[in-house]
Amino acid sequence: MSKKKVLILSDHALSTSGVGTQTRHLITGLLEKSDNWTFRQFGAALKHSDYRTVIVNEDFIIKPIDGFGDRESLRIALATEKPDVLLIFTDPRFFIWLFEMEDEVHQICPIAWWHVWDNYPFPDYNKPLYQATDAINCHSYLTYEMVSEHFPNKTKFIPHSIPKNVFYPLEESETLNYKKQILGSDREDHFVGIWVNRNAKRKRPNDVLLSWKNFLDQLKIKHGHRKATLILHTDPNDSEGPNLLVTAEMLGIQDTIFFSRDRLEFDKMNILYNISDFCLNISYAEGFGLSTLECMQAGSPIIALKTGGLTRQVVDHRDGTENGVAIDVACKSLVGSQQVPYIYEDYAKCEDVADAIFKLYSMNKTERSELSKKVKDYVDSEFAYKSTIDLWDESLTELCANWKENYERWECKTY
């Protein structure tokens, strides 16, 4: 049987972005599963340092591009590569040009989409995009609930997942040694949190620092010390966000903050997750929240707002228990723009975040150990890498076999 060729438009699969790493895991997993697939990717970024084609292997080839491509480059790829599937994976606003030429794409192949939408209400303004797509695989359950209600026959839930050998618990002695190496021996007994996000408004970085200050105040009042460190894996000087160095100094917490500024490989990130007692995410709009899943796979609990894709991570949907602390939404704001006319933003109170941190701090060693096992078991069950790969294999196989029967071509009738 000849291999089916998939043309992917997403972040460069060898980049460190969430979309990039998930693209890499997906391609690698499908190639390891069977010999049925071969992949070509337009690897997106704002700018690349090297535009030479990357041949990972004969079935995994990446062409770096600025942005997510354009009509002409896609037309050339469709004509020369003749893919069996076009797979897109990122915010739909980057692909409006593609949806406008979906009739040209469908002369060659179907369109699959690994999709996420951050929040309610259902985006009626996206209906033309959904109608133009042949398979909508949602990586957050909230997105699946919204879209499947309107397009049940082509919508599936296929969550993000990570190979087990990427993030995993380290031995306790090894973790302690890394903790002393990275944070210093003077912080050996510190309670450690980690925040892994871009320093941008949506991620609420200043509110993270304010929440941390509130926690430290509680710690000082109730225990007489501030033996705690928050790792911020971000650029404190990112132009998209506030100057976190100045904010930390204003709040008087600069001595409790540790900035991890460099892009790190998986093994280094695994160490950071292991030396952390929890991972925090309070973004007001979060489609999935990959860092919290990564941290849970390393055995550390999370503190997360019950919004978007975070809800199914922080709350065990099977019994309602929490994989750390789930924070209730304190305020919903209906916002919008010309391209996205309406969508909710969800906000947590900084006081609730501080209380959540203190709740985890107050657990004894046995309780923390049990929680660590719980979060690791939950990831292994509900975000299993093998399951994600199997579901994608089934979805793409079914799509290649049946898409022409289900595709409704537009017809222009004149009278």
Model regions and ranges:
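Nucleotide-activated donor-binding/catalytic signature segment of Leloir-type glycosyltransferases, i.e.
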Residues: G241-R263
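Conserved donor-binding/catalytic core segment of Leloir-type glycosyltransferases
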Residues: I8, D186-K203, L209-W212
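Carbohydrate-associated surface elements
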Residues: L142, S161
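N-terminal subdomain of nucleotide-sugar transferases
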Residues: M1-D50, E81
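A short helix/loop element that forms part of the nucleotide-sugar donor recognition site in Leloir-type
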Residues: Y168-D186
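Short hydrophobic beta-strand element within catalytic cores of glycosyltransferases
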Residues: P301-A304, V314-V315, E322-A326
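Aromatic "clamp/platform" in nucleotide-sugar-dependent glycosyltransferases that forms part
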Residues: Y284
